Amino acid sequence: IFQDPYGSLDPRMTIGKIISEPLDIYRKNLKIEEKEELVITAMKDVGLSNKLFNRYPHELSGGQCQRVGIARSLINNPSVLICDEPVSALDLSIQAQILDLLEVIKEKYNLTIIFVSHDLSIIKSICDRVIVLKNGNIVESNNTINLFKSPQSVYTKKLISSVPSPIPLK
């Protein structure tokens, strides 16, 4: 799932086609009706009305476009979902909705979610485990509670102390 919900969707494709594209690549043997059924199910799972099936990305809000990206990423039932700053381009109320949605689909699809972010308050509130990177290298890895309560590396300590966090630990 990408950071820019608009930029990650082909503006010439309908929402249904965007979501079904991975099926065209990895499950070519499916009939059109089967693909449509899978797309509509994925849309429902992310809170999108099937009335959006034949619409285009420019007709949707940023939050709806991000839900399209999430539906597209779920269409082939992955075991791992990589989210690259998936809420940073969204306003706060939509951020909360998308984060709640990710939590729901994590359980429903039995997913491991790799959540890439610089926003420590979000990391603190949704992640079970945190890996801190500096210049592409891992400087610390721990469960979220321990990492925020007792960071070991100097870099992690500086990182945590540089950003006030209003969200308490889980």
Where are these regions (language model features)?
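Conserved ABC ATPase signature
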Residues: 56-60, 64
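Hydrophobic anchor residue at the start of the ABC signature
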Residues: 70, 98
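Conserved ABC ATPase "signature" region
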Residues: 33-51, 160-161
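A short, surface-exposed alpha-helical micro-motif characterized by mixed small hydrophobic
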Residues: 123-125
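ABC ATPase "signature
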Residues: 141-142, 150
